[in-house]
Amino acid sequence: MTTTKTNLLDFDRKGLRAFFSEELGEKAFRADQIMKWMYHFGCDDFDQMNNINKKLREKLKQKCEIRAPYVSEAQHSVDGTIKWAMKVGDQDVETVYIPDGDRATLCVSSQVGCALACTFCSTAQQGFNRNLKVSEIVGQIWRAAREIGLEKETGRRPITNVVMMGMGEPLLNMKNLMPSLDIMLDDLGFGLSKRRVTVSTSGVVSGLEQMIGKVDVALAISLHAPTDKLRSEIMPINDRWNIEAFLACVREYIASSNANRGRVTVEYVLLDHINDDMDHARQLAELLKDTPAKINLIPFNPYPGSPYKKPSNSRIDRFMKTLMEYDFTVTVRRTRGDDIDAACGQLVGDVIDRTKRTQVKQQGEAIPVKLFNLDVLQQGKAE
């Protein structure tokens, strides 16, 4: 859908106030009122905003819109997990809702596809098209809240936690990630606690450096290997920023953060007979000895055509117990939504691939382990 109207979901509070002042000739408090309507009440109809005068409502209808991605398909798991295909332009990204008692976590995408080509991730096999806009990132939360039921309707928050662990690498979309995080944390936005918003990164050091001292949220890092040699084999980004550089930046961010309570969450996908033996566990413990961390082990979630397998329960248990001998807090992630391909590493969406990765795969050739031009992404030229 092509439109010349300005989508107000693309602005954080600072940007919305500037837009109201400079483009609409209105006072800042009007922007605050609109923001509250959008995020507290899930309102996308200016006529329903009854504390806004009619003249301004008419101006807003002429020049602006409130447009979030819409749900093109929904799949429901037996465990209560819901996976939505969210329409962004002519493509889809996937968003996952994971209820757990009084908590409800939303796994949000940051890109259409992913540029990083991690060999164990289904999203990576789809290739990459573009970064999501602010309205397409926060719009996933906005739409999910509408689908589940707004707090004013149900008496409980529809979303209590947000994890930037969907499709894409969040720190390759800094231009749109930062204002999106501001909206998630803002009392006039979604009003989430900084400890309940998690950004996960595969190791984009330049992006993490930009976050230091500017935004304080929970940090999770996708490590997945204890040595540079193995990590480079399964995660090509390691050739750009190796483990040492990555962990040094992580320690700097954690030192500046209150949200993380002094330690980072290390995500480690367990691939059968690839990175899951006791030597790997001991190497991982040695690697992390100077980085305060809790370790989240993720048994591999298979997807069609995957070259990897999930380890046996005994191998998972041995790996976990070896790490615990070094006094690490270790958890094994409980798989949710795997019956609808909504588990970690299984999200695919509908991607018009700019990397030709899918074309190569269809021709029966090995997918080249090559990064999309990261500089293009970091400069915000892949919108």
Curated annotation (Swiss-Prot):
[4Fe-4S] cluster binds at residues 114, 118, 121. GO terms for biological process: rRNA base methylation; tRNA methylation. It is found in: Cytoplasm. It comes from the Bacteria. Its EC number is 2.1.1.192. S-adenosyl-L-methionine binds at residues 168-169, 200, 222-224, 301. One of its GO terms (cellular component) is cytoplasm. It catalyses: adenosine(2503) in 23S rRNA + 2 reduced [2Fe-2S]-[ferredoxin] + 2 S-adenosyl-L-methionine = 2-methyladenosine(2503) in 23S rRNA + 5'-deoxyadenosine + L-methionine + 2 oxidized [2Fe-2S]-[ferredoxin] + S-adenosyl-L-homocysteine; adenosine(37) in tRNA + 2 reduced [2Fe-2S]-[ferredoxin] + 2 S-adenosyl-L-methionine = 2-methyladenosine(37) in tRNA + 5'-deoxyadenosine + L-methionine + 2 oxidized [2Fe-2S]-[ferredoxin] + S-adenosyl-L-homocysteine. InterPro entries: Aldolase_TIM, Methyltransferase_A, RlmN_N, RNA_MTrfase_RlmN, rRNA_lsu_MTrfase_RlmN/Cfr, rSAM. HAMAP family: RNA_methyltr_RlmN. Belongs to the radical SAM superfamily. RlmN family. NCBIfam families: PRK11194.1 (NF008396), rRNA_mod_RlmN (TIGR00048). Specifically methylates position 2 of adenine 2503 in 23S rRNA and position 2 of adenine 37 in tRNAs. m2A2503 modification seems to play a crucial role in the proofreading step occurring at the peptidyl transferase center and thus would serve to optimize ribosomal fidelity. This is Dual-specificity RNA methyltransferase RlmN. The gene is rlmN.
